[in-house]
Regions:
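Active-site-adjacent loop/helix surface patches within enzyme catalytic domains
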Residues: 1-118
Length: 118
């Protein structure tokens, strides 16, 4: 499973925490055409362990490993009603900004595949 997700070799600034359970999937978009590597560097620059998402779905319809499926993400603000969601959710981010243009069909197809395999 997830053999189609390419490993970009993104190294965390600090070790990731293993996720013990999964009962949520949270979808995001970058709000930019930034690469996963750029987002990884940006998140580290903000004091995060590394890229906050478990998987990234690219505009071309491919998928790339973020933190990986075994680890807790950092993709949900950890306060109020969302407290603790990172420890129990898979964070899937899509490259692009869908406020300015629609998601390409190939990307949408891969997003559905990743969700199905979660």
């Amino acid at each position: 499973m997830f053999e189609y997700v390419k490993d970009l070799g993104l190294k965390p600034a600090r070790p990731y925490t293993r996720r013990k359970m999964t009962d949520l999937i949270v979808l995001h978009h970058f709000a930019a055409d930034a690469s996963p590597e750029e987002v990884h560097r940006y998140h580290i620059g903000r004091g995060h362990k590394g890229i906050d998402y478990n998987v990234v779905v690219l505009l071309d319809g491919s998928a790339a490993r973020g933190r990986g499926m075994a680890y807790a993400g950092g993709h949900v603000l950890n306060s109020g009603a969302s407290r603790g969601m990172n420890a129990r959710s898979v964070g899937i981010a899509c490259q692009g900004n869908f406020d300015v243009r629609p998601m390409p069909a190939a990307q949408k197809g891969m997003l559905f595949r990743v969700i199905r395999d979660c």
